[in-house]
Amino acid sequence: MLCLTVCQPWASAIMAKPRIKVVENRDWSTPHRGVLAIHAGKSTKWIKALRAEMAAGACGERALAALEPLEPFEELPLGMLLGVVELVDCKPYSAEFEDDPFACGPFCWVLENPNRLATPVPYRGQQGLFEITFKYNSP
């Protein structure tokens, strides 16, 4: 199974129910479609940057409101497999994505059907898409 490492809080936002983040932004496109495991990276750089933006009032109100269910960010899992999603499309950013508070491209990976593990599993992440040996059984 292919896996993608995503920094927190974005990894948890992708896996959240109800849905928070349906588009993952990447600098590159992929021909892959289908099941994709989501790994939460170990870095807290985005959490720290987001906290600074929140304190400065620089974050978009829609994005902040959407992230509220994930608080507190410091308790989000790091360095773990969170579950699987279905990668249904990969498109360059366009007007189609303007209403999504998190979509900014340059490539928008459209994700559906998040299926979160009951308990996150420690796993070493990598850059890009990578194969994992973890076997995920859908409930």
Residue map of PLM features:
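Structured alpha/beta reader/binder surfaces that contact nucleic acids or chromatin modification marks
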Residues: M1-P139
